[in-house]
């Protein structure tokens, strides 16, 4: 490893430690201005009681920028991040937002751009054929959708990408969920159950002109 690489790794670790300490001491729901909103993610896995996260959503007109920091998680582990209808099972309608990978300190960060506000919803005016690239059990793709009126999805959840990683961290063995790209994820570890089911945090974000 070169001196430059060592310096970059040291700076990254130091920044992560400072960021976590700062976030942990910042009151929840405190935004910097009217266009920002901050809130916590809380542990949903009993075997990881110290897992935590902080979300900052900044409204910038046509889109929002959602910055997610998580800590207290297993190091060097992949997780999958979803926007969901309700924070706990059965979760309702859900859509795959992206991945978060922790570093060797169990800290992860990712930034997402999209619509994350009171207007966030899923709609299916009618049934239609759907592609089926993933057919493995226990959660094969559906070949068509059900019709639904607009359903708002105001909650967030984070899942282990691998059931084996969840088991290694102390979870029950062989628990598989559909919450990753191949539909063979582990259990949920963080969510927004600190908000009511029908009043998830995204409902408090108003789009800016």
Tell me what each language-model feature is.
Residues 25-27:
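N-terminal signal peptide c-region/cleavage motif recognized by signal peptidases
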Residues 2, 29-30:
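Intrinsic disorder/low-complexity signature
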Residues 2-14:
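Bacterial N-terminal signal peptides that target proteins for export
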Residues 30-209:
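N-terminal leader/targeting pre-sequences
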Residues 12-23:
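Hydrophobic helical h-region of N-terminal Sec-dependent signal peptides
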